[in-house]
Design a protein with these regions (language model features):
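Mature catalytic core of soluble alpha/beta enzymes
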Residues: 2-8, 15, 19-243
Length: 243
């Protein structure tokens, strides 16, 4: 049976239609500000850049209302002032994650350090020249808080939490999950020095991450100690020389 020219044209038209109906994937770059610092996304995705940006801004607002110590109306600020003990999903997740790291580090990591952070002049508040640490230490200790249901129980109502050390990495994970839900398998998400990457970059190679040389005035110089080529990891590159 001969394959007519008419049928051939119909077949080619159908193939072109199928190809044209498939969403095109390409690398997009999205940049902006979240959590009081900068973010950058490079991803191979069908999502347009403006849609990704809108999603990120929505997450930023959600995080500020939940975990910000700078927004006096946030849920965390109200908990720290003793006005609420209710926890949302973001706070529960991060309290449990922080507790795990605290136990693994034998208390070297601790989210109850907010009174100490303020005493030494971080968190935007003027600190004391010689803080009275002995009076503050009774309010610090990850074993002095626990979750019961959806509520936070403190051994002392004056205990306060600070998620600045974990919040950026958590938001990186939220953005990465959003990209993956929309089919992206190749991306790099960074917020300040925290990041997560998967797959390959636009050239088909591993993602290249710059690690700054750790000295005091390198905030402006941005000298690099080395460039690491990585994939399928989460990481942080900023150290205590930033503070």
């Amino acid at each position: 049976m001969k394959f007519s020219a008419y049928r051939l044209v119909l077949l080619l038209a159908a193939l072109l239609c199928v190809a044209g109906c498939r969403p095109s994937t390409h690398y997009v770059t999205v940049e902006g500000s979240v959590l009081g610092t900068t973010f950058r996304i490079k991803a191979r995705t069908t999502l347009p850049a403006d849609e990704i940006y809108t999603e990120v801004m929505a997450l930023d607002e959600e995080m500020k209302h939940s975990m910000s110590i700078f927004d006096e109306t946030s849920l965390l600020s109200r908990i720290n002032r003793g006005e609420s003990d209710s926890l949302d999903s973001h706070l529960i997740y991060n309290i449990l994650a922080a507790d795990s790291v605290s136990r693994l580090s034998d208390g070297m990591y601790d989210i109850t350090v907010k009174p100490l952070v303020e005493a030494w002049g971080f968190a935007g508040k003027e600190g004391q020249k010689t803080p009275n640490i002995d009076s503050i230490l009774p309010l610090v200790g990850y074993r002095k808080i626990r979750i019961e249901g959806n509520r936070l129980v403190k051994d002392d109502p004056r205990i306060q939490l600070d998620f600045n050390s974990i919040g950026k990495g958590y938001m990186v994970d939220l953005i990465a999950r959003m990209l993956e839900r929309n089919g992206s398998e190749n991306y790099l998400v960074t917020i300040a020095g925290s990041g997560r990457c998967r797959g390959v970059n636009g050239q088909g190679g591993k993602w290249r991450i710059g690690i700054e040389t750790p000295y005091d005035n390198n905030f402006s110089d941005r000298d690099l100690q080395r460039i690491a080529e990585v994939t399928d990891i989460s990481y942080t590159t900023s150290g205590n020389y930033r503070r």
